[in-house]
Design a protein with these regions (language model features):
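A domain-level signal for the structural core that forms small-molecule/cofactor-binding pockets
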Residues: 1-65
Length: 65
């Protein structure tokens, strides 16, 4: 069944995560017309020292000089 994986920085507020999962599920339900239980949403939180962009670690890219 349809699934969505979100890769991004850590979200500390559980209420924001709940809303994010609900909103994405709402959009999937509208698009696919399946029961809500058919969808899976996974939030993968990545620390800045584990992600690179343009060949540079995020932790280095936004490091204060």
């Amino acid at each position: 069944m349809p699934s969505v994986v979100i890769n991004g920085p850590k979200i500390d507020d559980i209420e924001i995560k709940r809303k994010l999962v609900k909103d994405i599920t709402d959009a999937l339900e509208k698009a696919y017309k399946l029961q809500r239980e058919a969808y899976t949403v996974v939030i993968k939180e990545n620390s800045p020292e584990n992600v690179g962009s343009g060949g540079i670690l995020i932790v280095d890219k936004y490091k204060k000089a």
